[in-house]
């Protein structure tokens, strides 16, 4: 039973690392409901950033125009 649990944990960890964003390329700030948030940026396609908010779970695609000054992504993509 212990080996089965360990095997399941390894599979889950590798699935998370396989399907989750890989490398943080830069950080960006965005406004939502008049509050400025900081997010890790993983990728860019056209005018969209793949971001994951710091202090939150999950990631999403957001337009570059959604972000405010202070991001560190200039020259990265």
UniProtKB/Swiss-Prot annotation:
Name used for this protein in its record: Lytic conversion lipoprotein
Role this protein plays: Inhibits of the adsorption of T5 to its FhuA receptor. By this means, T5 within cells excludes superinfection by T5 and other phages using FhuA receptor as a ligand.
Covalent lipidation (N-palmitoyl cysteine), chain numbering: 16
Signal sequence, renumbered to the chain: 1-15
Keyword terms: Early protein, Host cell outer membrane, Host membrane, Host-virus interaction, Lipoprotein, Membrane, Palmitate, Signal, Superinfection exclusion
Membrane topology reported for the UniProt record: Lipid-anchor
Induction (record text): Expressed early during infection.
Principal cellular location given in the protein's record: host cell
GO biological process: negative regulation of receptor-mediated virion attachment to host cell; superinfection exclusion
Compartments, as annotated in UniProt: Host cell outer membrane
Organism annotation: Escherichia phage T5 (Enterobacteria phage T5)
Domain of life per record: Viruses
GO cellular component annotations of the record: host cell plasma membrane; membrane
